[in-house]
A protein has these predicted regions:
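Intervening/peripheral non-core polypeptide segments
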Residues: 1, 376-377
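Bacterial N-terminal signal peptides that target proteins for export
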Residues: 1-11
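Bacterial N-terminal signal peptides
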Residues: 10-21
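Signal peptide processing junction and immediate N-terminal pro/mature segment
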Residues: 22-26
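The feature marks the mature, well-folded catalytic cores of soluble enzymes
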Residues: 27-376
């Protein structure tokens, strides 16, 4: 499989968009049931404000919030009046306005600050939008049996009630952070997550393939496999491979200055195998280099920028307080998402705890996406 350099990305994407346009103009049917891609217009972004054991995330959450409200509505869930007060103080401290007209506050009890995973999946079917609530058990108990998750399991129901949308309960344990949609016909995910026996005992890939097609309206399911070193989620797709348009996927690549650079490193092998699997499924693959490491609070980890959030006119990715690699990642994201403003927000405490910007946020598609998919900017 050829390696496509970031320098070739702009020309490649131009050709890709022309190819997509020709497919649509040729009259290819758009599925009646689908999940909009993340780059499509959004109604809002949601997050659960960190409290108690996650208070160290507050500064990065405030910075994240202050960017989002410049572009779209932000719904913030808080667990108690104390958490609300702390959240508002943090936003002020970082130069924002907690009374900004684009912020809506909701007192909804929850257990954690990872709303990507326990929050809603939005599905369009027959010209209506519904909320899917997939079962959640705190990543298969990755953080121990004493970590509660009952309240997190109810958040999707609460969101649906606020929005006045119908709710569909899915009796399969899974997280939205392990779902990548191209908005047309494909879902991409890591089998090591949904097939984890701590989540779904006895679940088979054949059954998953059938279930995913039925629940999402896709005709193609692409499974990668493997758990990167130190990944507490068991390998969520949003740290490994991301769609940037309906036919192009960016896949992490272990560079020479990364911990996983050795060819026989298990993480290196997982990323390479993912790229090969995705290319074999018919998608163009761009490799996203991991160019350095970071030592923070005794933890040494690679600077992996894959965990980005796409919003209305912007992209935010996790920053590692490493000026060289942070800036290089920003330049690459400008190529992947031309026309959008790019932000790199330091979130080291989140990363040490197991995730980044994408993991904390949950995007709500705009009602306009009911009509037809938006293929690119």
């Amino acid at each position: 499989m050829p390696h496509i350099s970031s320098a070739s990305v702009v020309a490649l994407l131009s050709c890709t968009f022309m190819s997509i346009a020709s497919i649509v103009s040729a009259g290819e049917a758009i599925p009646v049931k689908r999940v909009p891609a993340e780059w499509e217009p959004q109604e809002a972004i949601w997050l659960q404000w960190p409290g108690s054991w996650e208070k160290s995330f507050e500064t990065s959450f405030a910075r994240l919030s202050n960017v989002i409200v410049q572009y779209e509505t932000l719904h913030i869930l808080y667990d108690s009046p104390l958490v609300l007060s702390e959240a508002q103080s943090s936003i002020k401290r970082e130069g924002g306005d907690p009374a900004h007209p684009n912020i809506q506050w909701h007192w909804i009890e929850n257990n954690s600050a990872w709303m990507r995973d326990n929050g809603p999946v939005y599905v369009i079917e027959d010209s209506t939008m519904r909320v899917q609530n997939w079962a959640f058990n705190a990543w298969g108990g990755a953080f121990g049996a004493n970590i509660p998750f009952y309240l997190d399991n109810q958040v999707s129901n609460q969101v649906a009630k606020i929005l006045g949308l119908p709710i569909e309960a899915i009796d399969i344990v899974h997280e939205r952070g392990n779902l990548e949609f191209n908005g047309v016909d494909t879902v991409m995910l890591n089998w090591s997550v949904i097939g984890d026996s701590r989540r779904n005992q006895g679940y088979t890939k054949e059954r998953a393939n059938t279930d995913l097609k039925r629940h999402f309206g896709v005709s193609k399911v692409v499974f990668i496999d493997g758990v990167p070193e130190g990944d507490l989620t068991n390998g969520h797709i949003d740290g490994i491979a991301r769609f940037i348009n309906p036919t192009t996927v960016v896949v992490a690549d272990c560079g020479g200055n990364s911990q996983c650079h050795a060819p026989d490193d298990p993480t290196h092998a997982i990323f390479d195998a993912a790229a090969e699997t995705i290319a074999a499924a018919g998608f163009t693959v761009i490799r996203e280099p991991i160019e350095g490491t970071r030592n923070y609070k005794g933890h040494i980890f690679d600077t992996n920028y894959m965990n980005w959030l796409v919003g209305n006119g912007f992209v935010i990715t996790v920053g590692f307080d490493n000026p060289e690699t942070d800036e290089a990642a920003k330049v690459r994201l400008e190529r992947y998402f031309p026309g959008r403003d790019i932000y790199v927000i330091e979130a080291l405490d989140s990363w040490v705890a197991g995730g980044g910007v994408h993991c904390h946020t949950n995007d709500q598609p705009a009602m306009s996406t009911i009509r037809s998919p938006v293929l690119s900017d």
